[in-house]
């Protein structure tokens, strides 16, 4: 009986977050209240269409990145562009105002085929959400080992490990169509979808890997630890600050222990 009540409460909270977490859908040509369950299933998305009005400036920016001598994407080219985004479902469509920029660190996030650019995107919706995500990435599949990224996410979910919503979908950017990986950002919406309370979210800090000119790329990997993604939550109050700080310290210790273990294992192998 206790398990049944617990499951019922979790289901209620899940639906509550989906409906009231933020304005659920922007401008849709169907009654969203009749499709609440279907709108949370990525299988019902048939296509995402993105139009960047200032397409000339967008393409010029991608060209600059391509011609830049550096092997990684210089932060100065991460300009944000207003866009119109439309999601097509099996039962209708929804339109959003959004902002996009190029995603990724390396130039493999840009392709040029048949006279047009294709790039991985960071997307932010100004209103509503898609599968409860306000911020998400549309990634060129090869940058994440293609379908393996989706499979990995599904496996983690089976083991009840929090993982972002990840799936393949058709995307058109300024009338250039291709297959992309949709992946929600690590944010409070991801925690809500996994029925978790909002808290600190950490990810590997890659800035040290290629942001310092005096060092070779990846030379500082041993001291590249973690960083707090949602620092705004940590600033909400003393309790959230202490939780974030203590979690940050513990995670850094784990990173350092791992690096030390790897070094010892490598040295033992070389000694043999």
Locations of regions flagged by a protein language model:
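Bacterial N-terminal signal peptides that target proteins for export
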Residues: 2-12
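Bacterial N-terminal signal peptides
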Residues: 11-21
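Composition- and surface-driven signal marking solvent-exposed, interaction-prone regions
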Residues: 24, 158, 167-168, 268-270
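Regulatory N- and C-terminal appendages and interdomain linkers associated
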Residues: 26-97
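Extracytoplasmic/secreted proteins, especially bacterial periplasmic and envelope-associated proteins
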Residues: 34, 147, 151, 167, ...
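Extracytoplasmic/periplasmic, Sec-exported soluble proteins
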Residues: 42, 77, 115, 144-148, ...
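Conserved ATP-binding subdomain of kinase catalytic cores across diverse folds
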Residues: 88-220
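ATP-dependent phospho-/nucleotidyl transfer catalytic cores
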Residues: 187-272
